[in-house]
Amino acid sequence: TLYAKGAAGHGAAVCEGAMGFYDGLGGVSDRASAWHLADTLGLPVLLVVEPKGQSLTLAAELKGLDSFRTPSHIAGILLNNCTARMHALLAPMLEEETGLPVLGFLPKLPEAVIGSRHLGLYTAAEVENLQQKLALLADAVEEHIDWPRLLALCEKEPPVLPVQPETPPARVRIAVAQDEAFCFTYAETLEAFRDAGAEVVFFSPLR
């Protein structure tokens, strides 16, 4: 699996969820949701929430998320866009009301914002001062997250790599658009094509 291959040889693996935690196919199923992925792989979930304009209500929402499916796999909470003062106020209350540990917070960092557009984020090559922004984010993560407790969530058996079959000889050629306009490609997709015996050929629709 992609997870087993990517996690092999590393101390921890991160799987990023998208959309709402339980939002899956068609928006009416939990299949292919972040929860479904965690349930399939047996992963602990660090739920990132933004406490904007709410406090005790946030505890109610978290309890709902934690009880909506059994098991929920939610193992901890991270408060995003949160001040140190707000974190100090909310964390004890949320832990008492939900039974879930609050593992830290990330403050607002306007100077580290990476913009977005109607089709998603800008690519790395388009972001000005990307390395400086990443450094600011890394410093904030190091300072404001309880790393010992977070890493304790990762203490599980490493995934077992499946037996890799011999790559069959190339049978088909798959053309993949790649240029300034067509630059959002998942390396894992190309790898899967090649593993299945396809030859990947790049071309530019602009030229």
Each predicted region: which residue ranges?
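ATP-dependent carboxylate-amine ligase catalytic core
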Residues: 1-41, 49-76, 84-89
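Internal gly/pro-rich beta-alpha loop/helix module
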Residues: 55-166
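Hydrophobic/aromatic ligand-binding patch that stacks against planar heteroaromatic rings
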Residues: 36-37, 94, 192
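Glycine-rich phosphate/diphosphate-binding loops that line cofactor/substrate pockets in enzymes
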Residues: 7-8, 166-171
